[in-house]
Design a protein with these regions (language model features):
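Flexible, polar/acidic helix-loop-strand segments at domain edges
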Residues: 143-153
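N-terminal pre-triad scaffold of radical SAM enzymes
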Residues: 74-84, 152-163
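Enzymes that bind and transform nitrogen-containing heteroaromatic metabolites
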Residues: 2-31, 46, 66, 70, ...
Length: 351
C-alpha cells in the first residue's frame, strides 16, 4: 500500500467534510461526520452520518464498497475519531478492525468523554496505522456545535438580527406589525438557520408584539423547539406559540401544568436566568440554539459572553429612530458575506 502525500490526504479529508455537512439538520445531538475509503489512489467508498440513531459515516462508507476484498489494502479517511463504545450503534473502530482496513486517517479527536482518544488507541492496539490531525481545524469547525455541547455543557448559541443603516431593529411600538428589514430572499436564509437549529428563542416582548410562529416555512427542514421567556405568564392564550403544533418550552417563575406540546420550566429570574436556561436546555440534549430577539434578550447574551456566532443583516434603509440594535464588542473579528444585495456580518468566537 503506497503512502499518500499530504496533498492527497487533505484532498480526501475535504471530501469527508463535504459529505459530513449533508447531515446538518438530522444528526443532532450526534456530530456531523464524513468518511472516504481509498484504494490505489481511487475512492472506492464513501458515506456520512445521515441521522441520529442510524449508521455512522464509517459504516455507510464500508457498505458502499462493491468489492470488499479491496478493504485489506485501503485507507479510510474520517473527519472525526471512530467511536469505540456501544451507543445506539456498535463501535465503528471494531468494524474497521474486523474489515482489516490497515490505515486510518483522522481529522480530529472526539471530545466526547466516552470516546476521547479511545477509538484511536483501540485501532493502534490492533496493529493499525493511524494518523491524526489532517485538516484538524476545519474538522473541529465542522463539529463546533458538538464540541461546545460536550465541553461547555450548553447549546451552541447563534444570535441573529437585521438592522437598518442607522442601527435600529424596529420602530418604537406597543402593537402592530414590526418593520420588515429583511428582503424576501434573505428571509429564506433566516428560515434555513431555523431548520439547522435544535431550538429557537425569543423573549416575552417579541412573542407579544410580533406573535411569531417561530417555524420553518421558506426552507426545507424540521421546526426547531420553541423557547420563550415569560416570567409572569402574561402572554395571551391565543398566541401562536401555544398552538401545540411544535414542542415549546416556556421559562417562567410560576408553576403551570404541561399542555399539549408545551412544557413550563420554573426558574429564578433574579439569579442569572440565562445560566439556568442553558442548564435546562443541556439536560434536554438541545445542542444548538438560535436567538432571534428582541433587543434586550440579544444584548443580555452578548453582555454575558454567552454566544458562539452571530449573523447581522445590514439593510440599506434608514429608520431615523426606534429600537436600537444590540451592540457587539469591537474586539471580535467578523467576515462580511454578500447575499442578494445585502451584507450579512458574520461574527464567530474561537473554540
Amino acid at each position: 500500500m503506497a503512502k499518500s502525500t499530504k496533498m492527497e490526504e487533505e484532498k480526501y479529508m475535504r471530501r469527508c467534510i463535504e459529505l459530513a455537512k449533508n447531515g446538518l439538520c438530522n444528526v443532532s445531538p450526534n456530530p456531523m461526520v464524513g468518511a472516504v475509503i481509498v484504494c490505489d489512489g481511487r475512492i472506492i467508498g464513501e458515506g456520512y452520518h445521515i441521522r441520529c440513531g442510524e449508521a455512522h459515516a464509517e459504516v455507510n462508507a464500508i457498505r458502499s464498497v462493491k468489492d470488499e476484498s479491496l478493504l485489506k489494502r485501503s485507507t479510510i479517511y474520517v473527519s472525526l475519531e471512530p467511536c469505540s463504545h456501544y451507543g445506539k450503534t456498535p463501535p465503528c473502530a471494531d468494524l474497521i478492525i474486523e474489515k482489516q482496513i490497515p490505515r486510518i486517517v483522522i481529522g480530529c479527536q472526539d471530545p466526547f468523554s466516552e470516546v476521547a482518544g479511545r477509538g484511536i488507541q483501540k485501532l493502534r492496539d490492533a496493529g493499525r496505522e493511524v494518523r491524526v490531525g489532517v485538516l484538524e481545524e476545519e474538522c473541529k469547525s465542522l463539529i463546533r456545535r458538538f464540541i461546545t455541547f460536550n465541553t461547555l455543557h450548553r447549546p451552541f448559541i447563534t444570535l441573529k438580527w437585521a438592522e437598518s443603516a442607522d442601527h435600529f431593529i424596529d420602530i418604537e411600538r406597543t402593537d402592530g406589525k414590526p418593520v420588515v428589514l429583511s428582503s424576501p430572499l434573505t428571509s429564506m436564509l433566516v428560515h434555513k438557520k431555523r431548520a439547522e437549529a435544535d431550538a429557537i428563542m425569543v423573549g416575552r416582548r417579541t412573542a407579544l408584539l410580533d406573535n411569531p410562529s417561530l417555524t420553518v416555512r421558506n426552507w426545507y427542514g424540521h421546526n426547531p423547539i420553541r423557547v420563550v421567556l415569560d416570567r409572569t405568564l402574561s402572554l395571551p392564550n391565543d398566541s401562536q406559540i401555544f398552538d401545540g403544533n411544535v414542542p415549546t418550552l416556556i421559562f417562567t417563575e410560576k408553576q403551570q401544568p404541561e399542555k399539549k406540546n408545551i412544557t413550563y420550566i420554573t426558574i429564578n429570574f433574579n439569579h442569572n436566568p440565562l445560566k439556568q436556561i442553558m442548564e435546562a436546555l443541556y439536560q434536554r440534549k438541545i445542542q444548538s440554539l438560535l436567538v432571534e430577539g428582541g433587543r434586550q434578550l440579544l444584548q443580555s447574551f452578548i453582555d454575558n459572553e454567552l454566544w458562539d456566532e452571530a449573523y447581522i443583516e445590514k439593510c440599506p434603509s434608514r429608520l431615523h429612530s426606534g429600537v436600537k440594535a444590540p451592540q457587539m464588542d469591537d474586539n471580535f473579528s467578523y467576515s462580511i458575506e454578500e447575499h442578494f444585495e445585502r451584507q450579512i456580518w458574520h461574527y464567530v468566537r474561537r473554540l
